[in-house]
Amino acid sequence: MNLVYIITIIAFFSIGFELVFLHVPSVASVYQLCIKRASISTYLSKPLEKGILQHTINWPFGKKLLFIIIPTGISIITGLFPLICSISVLFYNRYYFEPLPVFNAIGCILIILGRTFTIFATLDIRKKNNQEGDSFMLKQQGFFKISRNPLLLGMYVMYTGMALLFFNYAFYIGLIIYFSNMHYRLLVEEDFLQQLFGEAYKQYKASTNRYL
């Protein structure tokens, strides 16, 4: 049983390491959409076209607060539930729940697969592009031949595994908000990539699915 909590803690530790040391730029981040929004057009050689990206950038701050900042905050807070519970069980012997036994193996496998997929896809894109700062490239090989968004797909798989192991209504509501929020921001990112890479990205979309 302790293996469930150990795997969960390692998964969150790897997320922290990834965020600090393996930064991958995104125009759909909270920082870019809500704070540094004026710089997004500088990545393009032409003015922003009408679409979900321009529409979202032009939202008033109140709407961004309601539909971007607050959902992101809720996702982060509720998303930490498995980590907090795992630490409490392993280090303080406090049992708030018991993972569903029938889902233990499946949940652990999904967590490991999800993190592995995200980490190796991140290393792949950074190795090919040697990304520093906010640079962008159209990656179509390796993990990106399987999915247009392998980093996010890996996070979805990981959290699905945790949902099988950690029963909590607030956590589940947070996951729904997280999936919805990230999917919308993914549409924003795709609009940007379509404008940045043009026909090349259109062909990539035709040959590779958004997730799987």
Residues of each region from the PLM?
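Active-site-proximal inter-transmembrane loops
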Residues: 132-155
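Membrane-anchoring alpha-helices and their flanking helix-loop junctions
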Residues: 1-137, 158-192, 196-212
